[in-house]
């Protein structure tokens, strides 16, 4: 699958599921694999009958990368790459409208081991206390205000000790 299409596919699928009837009624999905990091949805109302298929409600180009979207209330947050920038997006879950977009330059040198997977980002944002946290492809940790998209701070992640 083309890397560009992966981000569009993920957001399109999430939008289709939301339009069908709230995948997790009243349950936010604030980080990778959900609230408990186990991939389990606990607040799901099983429909009396399943539709024959999903109907696309909206579609938006978010960029490339491997970050999963997160859902907080009626907002979808997506971390992606657009050109030489890493971008944090807030989308309206009902319409797909971009509520805000914050970008910063994140040029990336492709090594042989990373060339197949592209320049990222590869980590899903995390949400806590009104803030979004991202880890960019070049090891930069950034905090954003979830309401406005304002970049609060940005720092190198530091060395990883095995």
Please place each PLM-identified region on the residue numbering.
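Noncatalytic, solvent-exposed loop/strand surfaces
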Residues: 22-162
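Bacterial N-terminal signal peptides
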Residues: 10-21
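Bacterial N-terminal signal peptides that target proteins for export
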Residues: 1-12
């Amino acid at each position: 699958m083309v890397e560009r299409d992966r981000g569009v596919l993920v957001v399109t699928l999430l939008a289709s599921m939301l339009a069908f009837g709230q995948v997790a009624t009243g349950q936010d999905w604030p980080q990778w694999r959900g609230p408990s990091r186990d991939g389990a949805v606990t607040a799901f109302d099983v429909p009396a009958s399943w539709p024959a298929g999903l109907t696309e409600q909206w579609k938006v180009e978010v960029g490339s990368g491997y970050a999963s979207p997160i859902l907080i209330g009626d907002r979808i947050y997506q971390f992606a790459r657009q050109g030489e920038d890493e971008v944090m997006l807030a989308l309206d879950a009902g319409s797909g409208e971009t509520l805000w977009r914050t970008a910063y330059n994140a040029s990336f040198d492709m090594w042989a081991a990373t060339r197949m997977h592209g320049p990222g980002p590869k980590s899903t944002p995390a949400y806590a206390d009104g803030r979004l946290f991202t880890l960019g492809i070049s090891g930069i940790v950034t905090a954003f205000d979830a309401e406005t998209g304002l970049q609060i701070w940005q720092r190198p992640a530091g060395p990883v000790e095995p």
